[in-house]
Amino acid sequence: HRDLHSFPTRRSSDLHNKKYYSKYKKWCDKYFYLPHRGETRGIGGIFFDYKMDNWEKDFLFVKDVGITFAYLVKEIVRKKMFLKWTKKEKEIQLLKRGRYVEFNLLYDRGTKFGLSSGGNPEAILMSMPPNANWK
């Protein structure tokens, strides 16, 4: 997935600003880092929020990144949708889901804000996987 994912993301970022990909990749790697594990989540990518430089340019950038993301997801699903999971792959998936839970509950700003400000816990925690494992 890494090649399929990083090249189009870099290309769509570079169309708007040659510094965006490097800047937002570093932000992604930092934001999605699990310090208690010494590891990052996922396979990389870009991350940004509160982008308020120039509304029209920012909108076009976000739109292009969204179109690229939709394309990438479609391609990955198309290539993988009929593959069978091995027992080992399922174990890895459950461990990755565990890392997702850890990140969301310990570090994600949106989750922390929602839970600390009296938000509806059911709605906030709805993204939690139904099954996860830890080692």
Residue ranges of predicted features:
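Intrinsically disordered, low-complexity terminal/linker regions enriched in Pro/Ser/Gly
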Residues: 11-28, 35-37, 134-135
